[in-house]
Amino acid sequence: MFPLSLLQPSHSPLCPCSQSALTLWPATRLIFGQLEDDILSMRNDLERRMQRVNEACRLLSQDTEMRRITDQKQQSRSPESEGTSPNSGKVGKDHFELMLNVRDFSPHELTVKTQQRRVIITGKHERKSDTEDGNYFHEYREWKREAELPEGVNPEQVVCSLFKDGHLHIQAPRLALPPAPETPIPISMDTAPRDAQELPPDAQTSNAEGEQQMD
């Protein structure tokens, strides 16, 4: 017959494990909460960094595109730009005129002035735009053309007008010269023989010496 102590079920080994699991669960949940917060913080920081990278790429793309468009415009206007070099204005019978393409500039960005006998046209464009991360985009463009005024044009009478299509028209009237008065030209009498006038001085001297020897 077995002793009674062997027949009684014993749960003593399981009790310490259950108590340890109940004791460690709050600490484990706290650790997982901290890890989750750290992961969220790292994710937010990564998103902010990605936004800055995207903003920088967008600005770089805009700058590259604007440079490409500007180069294309300059290449497309190269014949006209050559036509705006000094002494390139059209000189008519009664006026002087010059046509320039300034559609890239607004009226308040253009300046037209005369300096001695030259017409100087300048354009300056500047634009700044702020970004979301506190940076800014700066664009600056400067353009200049000169033309020589021909003789007979008064620099003080130069006028200019800007058309809606972006062309600047510069013109000035030519001064009307008074007609030359009728002036009689007197005829002077010369007593020297015509043959002697046509001979060179050396020939005339040799002829005179020959005549003296014959005498």
UniProtKB/Swiss-Prot annotation:
GO molecular function, one term: unfolded protein binding
Region of interest called Disordered, as start-end residue ranges on this chain: 63-92, 176-215
GO biological process, one term: protein refolding
Compositionally biased tracts (Polar residues): 72-88, 203-215
Keywords: Stress response
One GO CC term, this protein: nucleus
Keyword Lyase: no
Domain sHSP per the UniProt entry, residue ranges: 78-190
InterPro entries: A-crystallin/Hsp20_dom (IPR002068), Alpha-crystallin/sHSP_animal (IPR001436), HSP20-like_chaperone (IPR008978)
Domain of life: Eukaryota
PANTHER family: HEAT SHOCK PROTEIN BETA-11-RELATED, HEAT SHOCK PROTEIN HSP-12.2-RELATED
Family of the protein in this entry: Belongs to the small heat shock protein (HSP20) family.
Protein name: Heat shock protein 30D
